[in-house]
Amino acid sequence: MTEIHRAEHARRTEFLGREFLTWMMARSARDRESFKLPSGETFDVVFERAVTLDGQNPAKDRSLLKVDEPTESEEVRLSLRLGKQVSVARVNLIHDGREFHLTILAADLGLRGIRLPEMEGDDPDAAMPFRMDLCDQVEALVQGLFLSFIRLRLDPEAWKREVASIGRWVDNLPIPDSEDEAT
């Protein structure tokens, strides 16, 4: 694929990253941070202090918000009501008692600034394989989340219900219990 085709492909699909991060934030708030992967594994996603939201023209219509709890923030919800979507999110993934702090970029689903859990023990020969395994775990968690999102996004009826649920969350309205379906 030539550079021009790659750039055009990235431009055409970038909206999926923003929809994914916005969905992930709404689901994190709705389901009290708990996610279930297609494999059946569960883990928590906690949005941390900084979140960036972009409108249709990110060069002119961008909000960088630093709030204690982004999923509960009225400023974040107002930006979403104004048509913005999450474009950069700092998150904490909690899986099997381990915490992974990282930033996810919507443009390319890039993972940045990953902070891994500390290794137990002092064996320097074991450190690198251990850290590589942790990086693989982080990548697998985010890929699993994205796969769940894409499956939902490709099902017109399920996506319609999910968009309605996200809208109720954005408007701070109660969400009926029947919508607590895992994806």
Feature map (PLM): residue ranges:
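Intrinsically disordered, low-complexity, charge-rich terminal extensions
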Residues: 1-183
